[in-house]
């Protein structure tokens, strides 16, 4: 299976998981040039959640949780700002950055994976 197919499968698995937790999926693979994309954008009651999905099939060297770098966090923040500019109806919502880490078949949902400085 190609890397992009694996990533898409992991993101779909994460979306299904989030729906079981009563989150409303607003967007998947939101493109925010030049910062890349946000894997999933969802509503958790009145909180707008920007979610990065990381998948690792092997955890011998590193777990998925360890793959969210500072650089990636900055790109997510910038991409979230673009989403908010394009969708002003969400400008007064609380915002949160979460991580869905999938290690093999285990899903770990880390709310507030990082905060704005």
Curated annotation (Swiss-Prot):
Domain of life: Bacteria
Gene Ontology molecular function: nucleic acid binding
InterPro entries: Restrct_endonuc-II-like, tRNA_endonuc-like_dom_sf, UPF0102_YraN-like
SUPFAM superfamilies, per database record: Restriction endonuclease-like (SSF52980)
Family, as annotated: Belongs to the UPF0102 family.
Name this polypeptide is given: UPF0102 protein Fphi_0415
Taxonomic source organism: Francisella philomiragia subsp. philomiragia (strain ATCC 25017 / CCUG 19701 / FSC 153 / O#319-036)
């Amino acid at each position: 299976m190609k890397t992009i197919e694996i990533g898409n499968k992991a993101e779909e698995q994460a979306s299904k998981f989030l729906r079981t937790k009563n989150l409303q999926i607003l967007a998947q693979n939101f493109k925010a040039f030049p910062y890349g994309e946000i894997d999933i954008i969802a509503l958790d009651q009145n909180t707008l959640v920007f979610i990065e999905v990381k998948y690792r099939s092997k955890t011998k060297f590193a777990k998925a949780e360890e793959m969210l770098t500072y650089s990636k966090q900055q790109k997510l923040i910038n991409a979230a700002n673009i989403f908010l500019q394009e969708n002003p109806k969400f400008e007064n919502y609380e915002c949160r950055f979460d991580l869905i880490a999938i290690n093999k078949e285990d899903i770990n949902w880390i709310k507030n994976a990082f905060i704005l400085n």
